[in-house]
Amino acid sequence: MNKFKFYGCLGILAASFTFCACGNDDDNGKETGKNDVTWSTDGGIKACDHILFTAAGDANVNDNGRQIGNGDQEFVFTGKQTIKKGTYILKGWVYIADGAELTIEPGTIIKGDKQTKASLIAERGGKLIAQGTAQEPIVFTSEEAKGNRRPGDWGGVILCGKAVNNNTEMQIEGGPRTKHGGSDNSDNSGVLSYVRIEFAGYPFQTDQEINGLTLGSIGSGTKIDHVQVSYSNDDSYEWFGGTVDCKYLVAYRGWDDDFDTDNGFSGNVQFALSVRDSKIADTSQSNGFESDNNASGSTSSPFTSAVFSNVTFIGPKAVDASFQNNSDYINGGSVYPNNGSSLGRFQAAMHIRRNSHLNCFNSVAVGWPIGLILDNEKGDTQGAATAGTLKLNNIWFAGMDVLGTDFNKIYEDGLYDYETGTVDNTKNSFAHTFFELAANNNRHFDSADGWFDRTGYIPSADSPLIGAASFTEAILNGCTAVDYIGAFAAGDTWLDGWTNFDPQNADY
C-alpha cells in the first residue's frame, strides 16, 4: 500500500476551558464518580474527560448518551470511563489521550459514522480496554443498514504506543494527528480481545486509507487476541514497529493485504486465518503477507523480524473455481463501495521485500496466483534469506499458478535480472529456489484436495497437515508448540461464538 501522511485539524475550532454539570446522575462507570465535566483543548482540538454525548454539541455531554465523541471531526478524550453494554454511534476521530483510559464492556456494538470517517485512536500513553468474550464479543461496525454495508463505511481502530520502531517517532498513517514510537518495548496500550472490526478503512484518497486495525509501535504489555477484521477497505491488519504478540486473528475478505508488517515489527503472531473474496483486490496488488523493513528498504534497525506461525491463507482460487485474475472479473461484486477505491489484481500469498527479515513457520497457503515473492528492488531481502535472518520453514503451498517470483507484479517464475528488468525463464526464480531448499522443509502441491473440511480452512480428521508441524527452531520459543500446520487442529473451535462470516446481514 502507499504510505502517506495527512496533517491538520480539518477546521476544528480551539476551545477554552469551560465547565458544566453532567446531565445525568448515572456516571456510566466513570471512575471518579463525579458529575463535573472538564473541558480543555489539546493541540487546538476540544478535549473533555467525558466521552459520551446524547447528540452532537458540547452541551450534550451525558454519561447515558449513545454517541461517542462530541460530533466534531476531531475530539480528545482525557478521562477514565467505562462504556456499558449497548449500541453506540462513533462520530469523528476520537482520540484517547495520554493518561486516558476507555473501557468497553462485552457485548457492546459501536457503529462508525460514515460522514465523519469515524475512528477510535488510542494515543501514546492512552489505553483502550476492549475485553469481550466468546459469547459477547465487542463489535465495531458500519452504521449502514444490513444489505447496504460496504468496505470503507468508516475509519477504523488505531492503537499507538511507545515501543521501538526503526524510524524513531512516526506519524500514523491514514489521516489522524497521532504519532507513535519510543523506547519502552513493554508498553501497555490496553486490550483487544474477542473483538470484531467490520467495513472499516475509509479512503481519503486513492490508496490512502486507515486500515481495519492499525498498530503503531505497540508494546508487549498490550493484549491482542481473538480479533476478526472483515471487509476492510485497505489492509486488514498493519503493524508499524512494536513488540506486541498477537494470537487468534482473522482477516476476512479485505481489500488489500491481510497481514502487513513494517518499520521493525518484532512480535510473535500465532494462529491466524485469512480468507479472500475473489471479487475484491487492490490496485497495488493484494497479498496475504506484505512485509517491508521500511519504505526505502534501508538497513535501519530494528529490522522487521516478526515471527508468524500457524497461519492459514485461503486465496481467491480456493474460494472460487471460476476465478480470473483480471479487471473484468475483479469488480468488487456486491460490496463495491464506489468511494474512490481502485480495484486491481491478486498477487502472492507472501510478498516479502524492502529488506524485511520476516519469519514464518508451520503455515499453509492455498489458491493464490503466486506463492512467494522475495523482492530485491529496494534493499537485500534475498540476502537476508540466504543469511538465515529471514526464515520460511515448514510451509505448505497448494494450487498456486507459479511457486515464486522475484519482483512486484511479475507473474513469471523465472530468475529476475534487476539491472535489465528482464526475466530468464530458463532458470527458476530466487524465491522458488529458496522455498525448495531441503533445509527449509517446505512443500508445494498441485491441489489441497482432502486437506480441509467443509469450511475450506479447518483440517479434516485425516488431513496431512495434522502431525506435520515442527517447533525445533529457537526463534519459536515465544510460540505455543502444536502438532499441526496452519491455524487449526482438526475440529478446532477457537472461532466459535464470537466470529461472524456474514456481517452484511447481521442485525445490529
Regions found by a protein language model. Give the residues of each.
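Glycine-rich loop(s) and the adjacent beta-strand/alpha-helix scaffold that form part
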Residues: 136-137
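C-terminal motif of bacterial Sec signal peptides marking the signal peptidase cleavage site
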Residues: 18-21
